[in-house]
Amino acid sequence: MARQQAPPWVHIALILFLLSLGGAIEIPMDPSIQNELTQPPTITKQSVKDHIVDPRDNILIECEAKGNPAPSFHWTRNSRFFNIAKDPRVSMRRRSGTLVIDFRSGGRPEEYEGEYQCFARNKFGTALSNRIRLQVSKSPLWPKENLDPVVVQEGAPLTLQCNPPPGLPSPVIFWMSSSMEPITQDKRVSQGHNGDLYFSNVMLQDMQTDYSCNARFHFTHTIQQKNPFTLKVLTTRGVAERTPSFMYPQGTSSSQMVLRGMDLLLECIASGVPTPDIAWYKKGGDLPSNKAKFENFNKALRITNVSEEDSGEYFCLASNKMGSIRHTISVRVKAAPYWLDEPKNLILAPGEDGRLVCRANGNPKPTVQWMVNGEPLQSAPPNPNREVAGDTIIFRDTQISSRAVYQCNTSNEHGYLLANAFVSVLDVPPRMLSARNQLIRVILYNRTRLDCPFFGSPIPTLRWFKNGQGSNLDGGNYHVYENGSLEIKMIRKEDQGIYTCVATNILGKAENQVRLEVKDPTRIYRMPEDQVAKRGTTVQLECRVKHDPSLKLTVSWLKDDEPLYIGNRMKKEDDSLTIFGVAERDQGSYTCMASTELDQDLAKAYLTVLADQATPTNRLAALPKGRPDRPRDLELTDLAERSVRLTWIPGDDNNSPITDYVVQFEEDQFQPGVWHDHSRFPGSVNSAVLHLSPYVNYQFRVIAVNEVGSSHPSLPSERYRTSGAPPESNPSDVKGEGTRKNNMEITWTPMNATSAFGPNLRYIVKWRRRETRETWNNVTVWGSRYVVGQTPVYVPYEIRVQAENDFGKGPEPDTIIGYSGEDLPSAPRRFRVRQPNLETINLEWDHPEHPNGILIGYILRYVPFNGTKLGKQMVENFSPNQTKFSVQRADPVSRYRFSLSARTQVGSGEAATEESPAPPNEATPTAAPPTLPPTTVGTTGLVSSTDATALAATSEATTVPIIPTVVPTTVATTIATTTTTTAATTTTTTTESPPTTTAGTKIHETAPDEQSIWNVTVLPNSKWANITWKHNFRPGTDFVVEYIDSNHTKKTVPVKAQAQPIQLTDLFPGMTYTLRVYSRDNEGISSTVITFMTSTAYTNNQADIATQGWFIGLMCAIALLVLILLIVCFIKRSRGGKYPVREKKDVPLGPEDPKEEDGSFDYSDEDNKPLQGSQTSLDGTIKQQESDDSLVDYGEGGEGQFNEDGSFIGQYTVKKDKEETEGNESSEATSPVNAIYSLA
């Protein structure tokens, strides 16, 4: 019956259990501990598995072991007990298991060949050695043979076989001549891995020597030579060239197996004329460049330390100019067992749990066999505290009786591995392993470690105390390692004292004491300076030192980094070095080295000796000046929580004294790689105390400055991280502003690295409505903004933003007032229209009841009307404080409709509408026409009445508070027409067809009470725009026009007083711009921001059609034709002739009259400028616009433009406006075409 496989969760549970088992105890190497503790045996030395010996020497088979008590040894041979006492040649060394087989009294070593295994035993278990295979080295003689000369054709391949006698180990093969000269080898003649000598092609010169194969045997150190070969080469007139063919291996493919970890050697030897070249490749990949190398003139490929990924197909390519051939070698990589997890000795306390793991891999996969004390585990006595789970043995609740030695044997067909691991159960009270009452002396602000090695079973718990106090030292400035060492990160004066370490387990406790003394650092506070001296003078180099008085100070001098010999001309004192009678050989660098037994400090200076007495003694005046060299050898000392001392060695000042040192720092958390200035120090110092911020990983560098300039920065110092602390400040620039009507965005400037003070800097954002008793809302944010949603429209909020890190919160933050988002305001209240006389209309209003934000002004739109006729719509823009306005009536018989709305940043709100009273001379009052939709700004600046209505219904349009400059475009038609006025930013649309359309509109305006800018007007073209505005500033005031294109490029144009209108040039066709005008003296007084768009650029080849030569010629030809027709007409009438009349009133032109359907030949030219959006056709003519209607369209109801009697009107007119008649009266137009039909 097949065994049922366990579910996956069982394996997972087993793995988790194994991971939960406690770690084993490690026995220290202390000899006293090793001698006192009982321990099962452990094999410490043994012979190799394949042990080959020299038959001329005694045989030695090693086996050594340790244990307490000392183990005894015995051997097996070929799996049977080997009785050493019965063989007089075999002995065992004392206190060792090493076997010695002595052949001095005779005997054959071959009789002792076999498989040996050593057993080491004491009362706690038995350990086993590997199975050692003993073999005796052999070097057999070469069989005697007579070799005939080898006859070969010139150019043919040849193989000389060696066939050495089998030896143990295999001999080393090499070829020589009978005169003991080595055979020269190259890519044509070479020796194969099997020892044979291969000739890719034989040449006549190969007969000049003979060839002898030699075998060298390693153990016997002997060389045996085979009888030599002699060659006889048959010559021909010409050696035929041949394509390559393989001499070794044969055929096109072969296979090879190699073991993991061994070297793979692939070989290809080819024949051919000329000699082929060999190249190597791997199918599906590249050769491993790090462990592949070519040998034997590229005929062999060696891959060292083979692994599984080296398996695959390799092929060698042999080629010459006649062709190429390929041989494929399939490589399979197998593996003898190798360790993944070798079992280790396990030392436990009574009652503890543990495990032994024996995990190995191989190809094929090896099997695992457990043994205990040299016997299979299956035949060993049962142990309820032991459980075997494949490659793991689990021990639970171990006792003293559980001690034993376990063997793990893992094997496959290619080899085996054997490992011993003992299980020892100890109950040992804590013991201290170091000397008692040690004295440790350290330098102030340095880092130090106090050691307290201990041992015990179970593993003791270690605690540290200072000066007998009860608090345990761990955390903050202290850190306790698992081995018992106490690290003090930065020594201070108050850390001096007696430290006690206490180790405790269930069997007792042990303690030891360490006395710590803190010493002041050694510092050179007055360093020697660079000097220039004349030959023969006296020089003194100062070196004053401050050190701890309890330490012995030694001051020594170096010259050019070598110890200085103090001769008769020198005097060395405690704080100086004096040189009398300076000579040229005294020039060089002098180093003062002040040292104690704990630390040292160095200072260096350079002495320059001037040989010429006339040379100035001032080196700086005699040599050119330059920037100083960079400082070097930066050192951090006096490490404190909020400060550190930085010391550096100045560089050469290059003949200009150093005036300043700039210390910079870099931190690697917020802005890695960015250097910031920290502080500045005078050039006379080379050491400074730097005040630091908490929790910054500092790195410093120093820059020297003289009158010439700054040096290159020094190399960075080592990093120093300060300890953390709660923030001492909060973020700045806290604001609360709405981005939508129902939210408020809280923003602030984030804190930098030097103000974070700790890890995980974050911000606690609080808010609540102002002047309410609501509880604070709060949220933690890691960025620099937070959006509060679902807020009422434009209400004040109290806002607080507080910094926090892992060490705590910052100070209580200030309360900032912010506002939620604005919305469209309600309509102005009490909008009143009064008419004191016929010339003036007064308007008054009150502020909106719900402004829903900050009012930025009012927009008034009004339009005169008389009956069903509408005038031009006017637009006025007012400041937010203005509540009155007067309109001067241009037409005393018209009424006015007014629409007033307030504005916030969001836009214009609901409008209040009123009408002026009816004038007294209005005979028949008529109902006012429907209210026109507000004028809105589109992207093109042109909005029809239909478009404006749709736009007002679907979106909140931005109304531009300016008076437009208009360019009219009139569509001529006899039906109810629409006049569309094209403006830069506004459009007025009416349903009435006035007789004419004016090119501008005059607006009656009233200036605001305070200083302001209003009525900004923009008239754009494709590449320029004219700007005008109104203001009430004093005369001579300067302004600035600021405009921004759609690419966010901002430009400004200063405007001198009374310089209007202003033209903006270099604009881009078809681009949208925003514009405002503000006072140059007070930027806070600005106009409303408006938007306009330039028109599309015209093509370069566009020209006025009326100036084209072909058009003038055509007109002249038509005029001449008309004149001729008129003459013919008058002649025929004078003769009484008749001409047919074609009725045109109700019948359109037929197909036999195609030219009448081409439209009229009328030409409209308004100021020689094409309409916006028109383009020139390819042939230079103007494309027919939508106003160029057919002849039928010029009549009402499809009537033609002839009199009813069909008479011809001999006139030719050019239209200037497309609407020349009103009502339904038909117009009569004449053309040459009419004249042609009148003659028919």
Swiss-Prot record:
Membrane topology per the record?
Single-pass type I membrane protein
Residue spans, topological domain Cytoplasmic: 1132-1240
Biased region (Low complexity) positions are: 907-916
Q: Where are the transmembrane segments?
A: 1111-1131
Residues linked to a glycan: 305, 409, 446, 483, 752, 778, 866, 881
GO CC terms = axon; axon initial segment; myelin sheath; node of Ranvier; paranodal junction; paranode region of axon; plasma membrane; septate junction
Q: Where is the Ig-like C2-type domain?
A: 41-137, 143-230, 244-332, 337-424, 430-517, 521-603
SMART domains attached here?
FN3, IG, IGc2
List all topological domains (Extracellular). 25-1110
Q: Tell me where in or outside the cell this protein is found.
A: Cell membrane
What positions does the domain Fibronectin type-III occupy? 630-725, 727-823, 827-923, 1007-1099
User: What GO molecular function annotation could you give as one example from this UniProt entry?
Assistant: protein binding involved in heterotypic cell-cell adhesion
Compositional bias annotation for Polar residues: 1171-1184
PROSITE patterns according to UniProt: FN3, IG_LIKE
Q: Which UniProt keywords apply?
A: Cell adhesion, Cell membrane, Disulfide bond, Glycoprotein, Immunoglobulin domain, Membrane, Phosphoprotein, Repeat, Signal, Transmembrane, Transmembrane helix
Disulfide bond entries: 63-118, 162-213, 268-316, 358-408, 452-501, 543-592
**Assembly notes:** Horseshoe-shaped homodimer. Probable constituent of a NFASC/NRCAM/ankyrin-G complex. Associates with the sodium channel beta-1 (SCN1B) and beta-3 (SCN3B) subunits. Interacts with GLDN/gliomedin. Interacts with MYOC.
This protein's domain notes: Homophilic adhesion is primarily mediated by the interaction of the second Ig-like domains.
Q: What is this protein called?
A: Neurofascin
- Natural source organism: Mus musculus
Organism placement in taxonomy: Eukaryota, Metazoa, Chordata, Craniata, Vertebrata
- As recorded in Swiss-Prot or TrEMBL, the protein's gene is named Nfasc
